[in-house]
Amino acid sequence: MKKILVTIPVREKDRKFLEEKGKEFQFCYRTKEEITVSDVVDAEIILGNIPVELVPKAKKLKFLQLDSAGSTEYTASGVLMPDTKLANATGAYGLAISEYMLAGVLMLRKKLHLYQKNMEQHLWKDEGEVLSIRDSVTLVVGLGDIGSQFAEKMHALGSEVIGVRKHKAARPDYIKEVCQQEDLDRLLPKADIV
């Protein structure tokens, strides 16, 4: 029976879904810390990142689906068999991480971390002026999936957004100006939020 090694965290309902769709496969679930050579040697499909040094031992591997956007170490010479397909998770984290970044900005601008401490100590204490996102300048360094989604959210809240990317590319409507990394020294003093 063909084997699928799953190293990404899956809920019980996800296991049932996978096993229902892949009835011809034997599923092996391991955490990244539990993976051994014997887990990978006969796996034809691996879902999730495994230690790169174990990949060459997976001689039957046909498909490796990473749970990260980065894949550089897996593309090095001698890591994958020539006919193994590799897929990464580019685009999978933009929404969640950009929302997390927005929460961090709001926490700092509104001093929520200070008010949380006060609340725990049963204090009602003014922590001074809080700042709005509206009319601020946000400098987004990196306009991949995460940076672009964050820039779009900041723009929607009224911030003027300046983007920095490695290579010249078209400017999205939600970004006022797209610059390159060598412009950082000029841009940083203008930014309220980086």
Regions found by a protein language model. Name each.
Residues E129-I193:
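Rossmann-like dinucleotide/phosphate-binding beta-alpha-beta segment
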Residues L18, I46, L64, M101, ...:
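Generic structural signal for small/hydrophobic residues in well-ordered secondary structure
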Residues P82-V137:
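Phosphate-binding beta-alpha-beta segment of Rossmann-like dinucleotide-binding domains, i.e.
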Residues F25-K32, E44-N49, N118-D126, D173-Q181:
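Short gly/ser/thr-rich secondary-structure transition/capping motifs
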Residues M1-K85, P189:
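An N-terminal-biased, well-structured beta-alpha scaffold segment characteristic
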